[in-house]
Every structure is written in C-alpha cells, then in structure tokens.
Curated annotation (Swiss-Prot):
This is Glycogen synthase. GO terms for biological process: glycogen biosynthetic process. It comes from Thermosynechococcus vestitus (strain NIES-2133 / IAM M-273 / BP-1). Keywords: Glycogen biosynthesis, Glycosyltransferase, Transferase. InterPro entries: Glyco_trans_1, GS/SS, Starch_synth_cat_dom. Pfam families: Glyco_transf_5, Glycos_transf_1. The gene is glgA. Belongs to the glycosyltransferase 1 family. Bacterial/plant glycogen synthase subfamily.
C-alpha cells in the first residue's frame, strides 16, 4: 500500500516525545515489509544541520491563503522518502513555540492534504496527534484516500481559535472543537500506542473530557504497542557503554555501574543498589511522588540514585535540593544526553517510572533491553510491557504498584531494594526482561493488520505495492 505518514516529529531529525520515535522507526520496517511509506513533516530551521536538503523544491502548493514549498530528502539511516513542508512560519529553531501553534500546524496539515491530492496520492494517510487532526476531516469526502489517526498523548489535544474556522472549511457543527476531536470523528481507524491506554481513555480518569466520544467510536479504536529500535538499543554493541554484555554475560555489566558512579561523582560501590531515572521533569512522570519519598528511601537504605532530564523549574529545584543532602549518593543531571541515558540504562540496577499516566512509554522497554529492572506504576503501556516479579514462581520482569500514592511507590521501591540482595533471583529477573521482544517488527505486523482492516483484507495479508506518482501541478 501507499502510505503517507504526516507528523510534527520524526527521529532522529526532530524529536520531543515518543511520537518522534514512532515516525522515525515504524516507516522503515513497513517499507521492508513491502509498503511504499513516505513521511511528510515541517521544514524546521535546524534541519539543514542534520540532513542534506536540496535547494530547489519538488513542488509548490497553496493552502489557507499562503504559498508553501515541498522539499524531498531521505530519512537518515534509511531509504524512506522524506517530504519537508517549507514556510517561514517553521523557520525558528524550535519545534513547539509561541501562541500560534494552532494556526501553524493546521496550515501544515492543510499543506499535507494538498500535497496528497495533487502530487503523490497515497491510499492511506497515517496522521499523528493533534497537529494533523484536520486531515481526516478534509479526506472524509475523498473515496480514494483513507485515514488512520494515532493518539500519542490524549492530554495534548490542540487549541482551536474562532478565526481558524473561517479558513479550514470546518463543518458548522464542529465549531469550537479541537483538532483531536475532529480526527476522532472522521478518521477511518483510530489507535493509541498501547492496548491498555486504548481502554483507559474511555474512562473519565484518563479521557481528558473526550471519554464520551472515545466510547462512541470504540468500534474503530484499538491499541498497538510501540516498539524500540533493537539495533540501536543493543547492550552487546552500544559504544556508549564501558563494557558490552548480553543476557548470558551479565557479570560484565558491573564495569558499567562502576564507570557510571565515577562519571557522576557517586561513591564507587558495586554492591550499592543504584536506581536510575531518565525523564522529562513533569507531573505526568510522577515527580511529585518521587520528591515525597526519595529522602526517606535514601536515608533508610544504602541505595544510590541518578536522575537525567529537564522540565518544570519547581521539580528541578526540588531534585537539586535532595541531591545536596546526599552527596556521593544522589546525582541530578538537568540536561539531555543520549549518551548518558544509555550509560544509565547499562549501569543502573533499577529504573523507575512512577507515572500518573503513560500512553506507552519507551524508557521501560529500553531498560528491560539493558537488564535494568523497571519499577513502574501499572498504567497505560507500562501494564503491557512490565509484569510484576513473583519470587516464588520466578516470573515477571519488574516491580509494579497500582495506586498513585507515595506509600505505594515507596513500598514497591523498598521491595526492589530487598530483592536486589538475592543475586541469583535478580539475575534471572534481568535475563527475563532482556529476552522480551519489543522490536518494531512486532508492532509493524499489528499496523499492517490495521491497514488491512480498512479494506476488508485478512490481517495477515502482506503488501503488494504498486506505487504511482501523480504528475506535479505547475
């Protein structure tokens, strides 16, 4: 099938959250399966620093009383064609900024629709999050193009101002809706990035005021778990690590722990229980829980803690203060570093994700891949990826708690600390996690079945592509 991915992010070129990982990884696997997949995203001002882009556009289009240019390149490390939507409104060197995001991304979505109608006509437009929410509305009347809409985070639904309704051909009965709601109503298929999250968003607790609409469209709503790039995240070959290792050579992992302790100024003690966290410092990620229990945990145990990430100034300040009270045992790195994150995955004993909600989560899958035992709250994709350790039956891949309460999180963390003392059982726990399959191939098969369902094909039907290019309109 001819499939056009339309999104605001695509790793490794532009990434803020998990959407960038999906758009940067899934098309590569789908192309290997035989689909003709291409990506359409904004031409941000920082992209020329990361990829070679031709000076001349392949097509010039018009949308919302504006002229835009489309440039063609290739997603780095792949053969996936990448179309870049060029307009001065996307020239600044950040992805998200200012108060006009609704106008900019609706304009971008309109440009993608014009491109699909007039230059390269796909069979399916795969839209990602609110930035592309109007595309299913516009495509609803086109019998030749169907749409799939993926919810990466329902909490971000897209603003809507009255002036947009005058220039986007919005149906009168949708005036005042946000672009996420528009996509939910008009897309042929809707999916979230984990099965559990697909069920949770139909409830008031997680539905972000759209639970009624989501329940109404439940017949076309499903959940497909994200994957990770198992070649990129591979402890047996990761150059960021001091020592590579596999599930069968876990004893080599000790060198990474010592190297991490030395790098971050922690006491060098291979026997200490080292807990890591790589996260945005926002409430969604459970920072309020962590702040309430970390002092007590470090005082009660001989553990160490390392945090990597940036976010709300309040949480940054609180974490700095805790680190100052435990020199040599708590390291807070308020920055983004892909290399350091890999060293934390490869050197820490456990990895915490006490999220208030989590559509999918990728960090816990990377942690499992590296033998870093996850300690998570059972919500969203964390339910689908981490199973609770049962020491008697020797099952499970991590430690889990249910209620979003400090005591529950603290109790779970202490249980993991106690479990770490039983080295044989702990190594078996690490090995079970490292042998889990979170490859994108598994996810791509599920998306292939989703695409097939639109056309009434059996889920296992594999593509027989016959790509066509509609001549450019000049």
């Amino acid at each position: 099938m001819r499939i056009l991915f339309v999104a605001a992010e695509a790793a490794p070129l532009a990434k803020v959250g998990g959407m960038g990982d999906v758009v940067g990884s899934l098309p590569k696997v789908l192309r290997r399966m035989g689909h003709d997949v291409r990506i359409f995203m904004p031409y941000y001002g920082f992209l020329p620093d990361k990829v070679e882009i031709p000076k001349d556009p392949i097509w010039i289009g018009h949308a919302m009383f504006q002229t835009f240019h489309v440039y063609e390149t290739v997603l780095p490390g792949s053969d996936v064609p990448l179309y870049l939507f060029g307009h001065p409104c996307f020239n600044p060197r950040r992805i998200y900024y200012g108060e006009d995001e609704d106008w900019r991304f609706t304009f971008f979505a309109n440009g993608a629709a014009e491109f699909a109608w007039n230059y390269w006509k796909p069979q399916i437009i795969h839209c990602h999050d609110w930035h592309t929410g109007m595309i299913p509305v516009w495509m609803h009347q086109d019998p030749d193009i169907t749409t799939v809409f993926t919810i990466h985070n329902l909490a971000y639904q897209g603003p809507w101002r009255w002036r947009l309704e005058q220039i986007t051909w919005c149906p009168w009965y949708m005036q005042g809706h946000n672009t996420m709601a528009a996509a939910l109503q008009y897309a042929d298929r809707v999916n979230t990035v984990s099965p559990t999250y697909a069920e949770q968003i139909k409830t008031p607790e997680y539905g972000e005021k759209l639970e009624g609409l989501l329940s109404f469209i439940s017949g076309k709503l499903s959940g497909i778990l994200n994957g990770i790039d198992t070649e990129l995240f591979d402890p047996s070959s990761d150059r960021a690590l001091a020592q590579n290792y596999t599930a069968d050579t876990l004893e080599r992992r000790r060198a990474n722990k010592i190297a991490l302790q030395e790098e971050l100024g922690l006491e060098v003690n291979s026997g200490a229980f080292l807990v890591g966290m790589v996260s945005r410092l926002v409430e969604q990620k459970g920072l309020d829980l962590l702040i309430q229990i970390l002092d007590r945990f470090l005082a009660y145990t001989d553990s160490q803690f390392v945090l990597l990430g940036t976010g709300d100034r309040y949480y940054e300040t609180q974490m700095w203060q805790i680190a100052s009270r435990f020199p040599g045992r708590c390291s807070v790195q308020l920055l983004y570093s892909d290399v350091l994150s890999r060293r934390i995955y490869g050197g820490a004993d456990a990895f915490i994700m006490p999220s208030r909600f989590e559509p999918c989560g990728i960090s816990q899958m990377i942690a499992l891949r590296y033998g870093c035992v996850p300690i998570v709250r059972r919500t969203g994709g964390l339910v689908d990826t981490v199973s609770h350790h049962n020491p008697e039956q020797q099952t499970g891949t991590g430690y889990c708690f249910d209620r979003y309460e400090p005591l529950d999180f603290y109790t779970c963390l202490v249980r993991a600390w106690e479990g770490y003392r039983y080295k044989r059982e702990w190594h078996a726990l690490q090995q079970r996690g490292m042998r889990e399959d979170f490859s994108w191939t598994k996810s791509a098969l599920a998306y292939n079945a989703l695409y097939n369902s639109i056309y009434g094909l059996p889920p296992e039907t594999m593509p027989n592509p016959s790509p066509t290019l509609v001549p450019a309109v000049t």
